[in-house]
Design a protein with these regions (language model features):
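A short acidic, Gly/Pro-enriched loop at the edge of an enzyme's catalytic core
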Residues: 106-114
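A short beta-strand submotif of the Rossmann-like class I SAM-dependent methyltransferase core
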Residues: 116-118
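A short glycine-rich, Lys/Arg-flanked "PGG" loop and its adjoining helix->strand segment in the class I
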Residues: 133-158
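Class I SAM-dependent methyltransferase "Motif I" SAM/SAH-binding loop
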Residues: 52-54
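SAM-dependent methyltransferase
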Residues: 159-218, 224-226
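Core SAM-dependent methyltransferase catalytic element
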Residues: 221-222, 228-246
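Class I SAM-dependent methyltransferase SAM/SAH-binding core
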Residues: 57, 62-103
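Conserved class I S-adenosyl-L-methionine
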Residues: 1-43
């Protein structure tokens, strides 16, 4: 179990999201992610689920193509920010559920699209202060990730798609992560070369290989033939999953 409070981790995430500082590779990947999705959503409107929706920005970005938007967010403070943003932008088809997405109650085959963006897939894990828990075997078959994504994969309609923004496990990614977290007032506690970066404030962010992605998604019932990797840049993929059957 973790002694770091959920509030501490939420505050670290909020600080990173609101920071004016962002390393160029991360900024570039986020921008390319949004460009690709805006283009893909032109055929809407769609019913969208967004795992770890943060400040609700995507409900605004995708509003022209959105029939309804359900954001799932564990931080009440981030949810408040989302409500404020939606009020300001006059978004009336969005709803936020304050919960752990792994425990969310969602209707089967309801959504056209499921999102888990801005590297949120790499934040999903069993919380522990013992960093040795997160060994290669754990990262290749992360139980909490599998529980969360399986739940939302069941909520995806046949013919629907899920999109995940994921860090590549390369040194350039690790350098960008460390740079970002240090510049947002956090203290990195993992040695260089780990497959994840953790901070004393409770933030945790994993990097992925195509094999580790296929292994984790395979445990969710998703075949390798249904997974596509879209390069965002040298440090990130937008991973697309198409649901062809139950």
């Amino acid at each position: 179990m973790s002694n770091i409070s959920l509030e501490s981790e939420n505050e670290a995430v909020k600080r990173a999201l609101e920071s004016s500082y962002c390393p160029e590779p991360i900024r570039e990947a986020r921008q390319k992610q949004d460009e690709i999705l805006c283009e893909r959503l032109r055929q809407g409107p769609y019913k969208i689920a967004d795992i770890g929706c943060g400040n609700g920005y995507h409900a605004v970005l995708f509003a022209p193509h959105c029939l309804l938007y359900h954001g799932f967010e564990i931080s009440p403070e981030m949810a408040e920010d989302a409500h404020a943003l939606w009020k300001k932008e006059r978004i009336d088809n969005a709803q936020i559920f304050i919960c752990d997405a792994a425990e969310a109650v969602v209707e089967e085959e309801f959504y056209d699209l499921v999102f888990c963006l801005y590297f949120t897939p790499g934040n999903i894990r069993d919380k522990s202060d013992d960093l040795s828990l997160y060994n290669d075997a754990y990262l290749d078959r992360n139980p909490r990730f599998i529980q969360t994504i399986s739940r939302f994969y069941r909520a995806l309609k046949i013919g629907g798609s899920a999109f995940f923004t994921m860090y590549k496990n390369v040194p350039e990614t690790e350098a960008a992560q460390v740079d970002f977290y240090v510049h947002t007032g956090q203290r990195v506690v993992t040695p260089l070369g780990s497959r994840f970066v953790a901070t004393a404030e409770g933030f945790w962010s994993a990097r992925w290989t195509q094999d580790s992605i296929a292994s984790n998604l395979g445990a969710c019932g998703i075949g390798a033939e249904d997974i596509a990797f879209h390069d965002l840049n040298d440090i990130a993929w937008l991973v697309e999953v198409e649901k062809h059957s139950h």
